[in-house]
């Protein structure tokens, strides 16, 4: 009987306060997070930024209990999915591969090989494809496969995106309906979808499908909610978690909250549309930062739809995805990791100088300039960063 390995890919997160610095270092060491024209500066800059941001990030994690629950929740999702698949007669074992913290992708691959798995289904826990999330994880897995002859022997099927999965849409709709029903004026409550943002250049210059998939997903969810409740709620779609000086997808969530308050919205339901697990961006950014902004701008009832986590209907939807992947047309790892031809991401040593910032998260030229300035400030022990208290 075929032994199927289901590889769940996610971002990862620091589980303890002392893990925050190393986690940030891993994150910013990824050349797809910070784009630099010279690879030699990647790790020094990652060290500098992670050192600079560590204190603020530690405070954020302290506010949610001292660490990210992402690993614990993802492992719970893996166990529930494994059980659901075995109940369908599929001999499956689930594995977790985090991009920037434990358990890393390398560890999951070693476990898969040790368990004598015959076929692997790769399922990113990002419903919407982006070259910086699912794409980065697919390419990391491909990199590991290229240097591992034993891993190359395994059949690998990939699920690239699943924003329109029936179980996912239905789960989101049910959770939204629960919050609407708890409002004093259900049909007057405003729904604010908030998705993790990406740089505008990813979409407009690099052809990233992320924005289109997010928009289509929101429409599917709203349609499901309207059919269930029998009335329509007004809604907006916004983007959060912007990092760095580059323009990201708009509108930004914090600005939308201010505008909604100014327009007289009193009951607000915030829906984290691109997150399937509770983590720092739901528990701290939305529940603390955004809630404060909303209340300060006249919104009285601020409600946040909980993340899907192990919601049974959602887990069943994931099982549907895996079953369909095993029986349907195969999408190889190479196909899943493939980028639009105009995107320059790999290999890093081929990046060129210039002023076109296609597919950049941070503009490499600006980052290089800032790095040089910061380096000299560290050497001389004086400057603007010392003046404002960052150094």
Swiss-Prot record:
PROSITE patterns in the cross-refs: FERROCHELATASE
Intracellular or extracellular location(s): Cytoplasm
Keywords: Cytoplasm, Heme biosynthesis, Iron, Lyase, Metal-binding, Porphyrin biosynthesis
Sites where the protein binds Fe cation: 196, 281
Major site of localization recorded for this protein: cytoplasm
GO process annotations (BP): heme biosynthetic process
NCBIfam families: hemH
Family indicated by similarity: Belongs to the ferrochelatase family.
Protein name in UniProt: Ferrochelatase
Species this protein is from: Prochlorococcus marinus (strain SARG / CCMP1375 / SS120)
């Amino acid at each position: 009987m075929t032994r199927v390995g289901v590889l769940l890919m996610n971002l990862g997160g620091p589980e303890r306060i002392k893990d925050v610095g190393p986690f940030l270092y891993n994150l910013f060491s990824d050349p797809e997070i910070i784009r630099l024209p010279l690879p030699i500066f990647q790790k020094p800059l990652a060290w500098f930024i992670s050192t600079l941001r560590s204190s603020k990030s530690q405070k954020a994690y302290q506010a949610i209990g001292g660490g990210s629950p992402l690993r614990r929740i993802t492992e719970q999702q893996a166990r529930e999915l494994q059980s659901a698949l075995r109940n369908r007669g599929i001999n499956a074992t689930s594995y977790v591969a985090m991009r920037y913290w434990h358990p890393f992708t390398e560890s999951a691959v070693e476990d898969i090989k040790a368990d004598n798995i015959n076929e692997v289904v790769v399922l990113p826990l990002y419903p919407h494809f982006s070259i910086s999330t699912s794409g980065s994880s697919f390419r990391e897995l491909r990199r590991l496969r290229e240097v591992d002859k034993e891993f190359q022997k395994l059949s690998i099927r990939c699920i690239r995106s699943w924003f329109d999965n029936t179980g996912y849409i239905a789960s989101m709709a049910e959770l939204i309906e629960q919050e609407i029903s708890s409002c004093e004026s259900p049909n007057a409550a405003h729904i604010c979808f908030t998705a993790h943002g990406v740089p505008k250049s990813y979409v407009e210059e690099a052809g990233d499908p992320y924005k289109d998939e997010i928009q289509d997903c929101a429409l599917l969810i709203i349609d499901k909610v309207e059919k269930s409740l029998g009335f329509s709620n007004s809604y907006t779609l916004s983007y959060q978690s912007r990092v760095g000086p580059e323009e990201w997808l708009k509108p930004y969530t914090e600005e939308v909250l201010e505008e909604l308050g100014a327009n007289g919205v009193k009951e607000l339901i915030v829906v984290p549309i691109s997150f399937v697990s509770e983590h720092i961006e739901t528990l701290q950014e939305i529940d603390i930062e955004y809630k404060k902004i909303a209340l300060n701008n006249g919104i009285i009832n601020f409600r946040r739809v909980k993340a899907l986590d192990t919601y049974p209907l959602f887990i069943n939807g994931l099982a549907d995805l895996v079953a369909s992947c095993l029986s349907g047309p195969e999408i190889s790892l190479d196909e899943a990791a493939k980028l639009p031809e105009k995107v320059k991401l790999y290999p890093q040593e081929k990046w060129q100088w210039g002023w076109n910032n296609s597919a950049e998260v941070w503009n490499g030229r600006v980052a290089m300039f800032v790095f040089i300035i910061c380096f000299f400030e560290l050497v001389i022990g004086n400057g603007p960063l010392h003046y404002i208290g960052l150094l």
